């Protein structure tokens, strides 16, 4: 609930009236993905998306950013890595970070373009330790990609890890999970989803 200000000085978070695609935890904030926006709560006040004072910007204030691209960028999922929060749309990946600054604040937070790989929005990207894996189902068979070194300074490295077994992957893969301790990846099809076969 808004305690201070009005619609001009303390406007509603951009998720109001829109579907929330995903909720993740990032740097002591709850992050909501809604349409092409990412909205982060106040620091350590996980369900508060309002500023505390309309007079000045605080480092703990909520963050509300929009991704921008030449393609539609509805955001579906996100995974944290060393460089920040890697965010997935159906056709691109973005990085939410504080740039060279140590603290993630409303003034330092920014979303930058990272890569342009198709992502199966019915699936979830998975952390593989220091890298991130994700499914792509735009070809005849599904593909599994691994993205690493995502930062604001360099282009990430993206490798198709499923190339060696490409013809064994059905096109409608939707579930992937990883066990870094056992060096194991498991893939499955969720038969409750309406996906192409």
Segments (PLM) and residue ranges:
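Homeobox/homeodomain signature
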Residues: 5, 13, 28-29, 83, ...
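Elongated fiber/stalk and passenger scaffolds
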Residues: 4-15, 22, 29, 133-139, ...
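A short helix->beta-strand "capping" segment at the edge of beta-propeller domains
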Residues: 2-18, 54-71, 158-169
